[in-house]
Curated annotation (Swiss-Prot):
This is Formamidase. InterPro entries: Aliph_Amidase/BUP, C-N_Hydrolase, C-N_Hydrolase_sf, Formamidase. Is an aliphatic amidase with a restricted substrate specificity, as it only hydrolyzes formamide. It comes from the Bacteria. GO terms for molecular function: formamidase activity; N-carbamoylputrescine amidase activity. Keywords: Hydrolase. The keyword Hydrolase applies. It catalyses: formamide + H2O = formate + NH4(+). The active site is at residues 61, 130, 163. Pfam families: CN_hydrolase (PF00795). Residues 15-257 form the CN hydrolase domain.
Amino acid sequence: MASGLGGLNKSPNGVVIGLAQLALPDPHTREALWMQTQKVVGMVAKARRSNPGMDLIVFPEYSLHGLSMSTAPEIMCSLDGPEVMALREACKTHRIWGCFSIMEANPHGNPFNSGLIVDDLGEIRLYYRKLHPWVPVEPWEPGDLGIPVCDGPRGSKLALIICHDGMFPEMARECAYKGADIMLRTAGYTAPIRHSWKITNQSNAFTNLMQTASVCMCGSDGTFDSMGEAMFVDFDGTIMAEGGGRADEIVCCELRPDLVREARVHWGVENNIYQFGHRGYVAVKGGARDCPYTYMHDLSAGRYRLPWEDDVVHTDGSSCGFAAPERDFKPTPGSWKE
């Protein structure tokens, strides 16, 4: 499927998305965090000016915080804090949807790595906490809100995953299973992950008949280098549009969630998201509906264990300078698992 010349030629059923390859920041004070927030607010305005038909602008993971992995309270955010309020107001002012990244204060443990989707009226439509922090590098609390989906612009259904989440095929499958036709993936990845980034963005799309829109931070903060690499993938796994390494570029594409929904209903061959739960429906009525996967049974029973479990070397963050944790996982009050 064509990209509509980067969304310049918008179809009646099209959703135009911009992926902002934001220059990598390095804030260490509340004032610096606020200055970076204002830069993102300015990029929301740029998105609207540069493409009047754009429906959604997506910012990468770490777009406010940078890659320092600092958990300092002065650079943590909250849903009702000034940074989030400024981002919401920017969406309302410019009548555009936005996807944003915050490092969220957590009084019960380490901060969460959280993502928000805000509509064009400034309302939060989706709130997600990263399920799979990039261990052993990242110190964030494992997410406890599940994988939500929300109604998006122009009849789309959106899901959001963050960076390392996308390396687990179960994440994208859950998004699709809950109805998402467009999955957003925000990241701070650096160049060594480039190949894995591309193939997982493609496989996540193809195996679930879902369009994916993914973007990393870009450029250098003097220590770390992020790669940009914005990428749109169609539901058949083909790349529709992609960016390079130019910081602050907004890469745009028109997606067609209506064609995703059509494929999910009408495809026979490689309708994998359906066939996964209806094995061999040519031979048996409705297909086999059982669960033959040992790891699924074990994970749900709390006994997930690999044959080589005792030999795994890295099982905490000590190799990256973090103290070994002493507490067990406990969902925060009010979470879906509490």
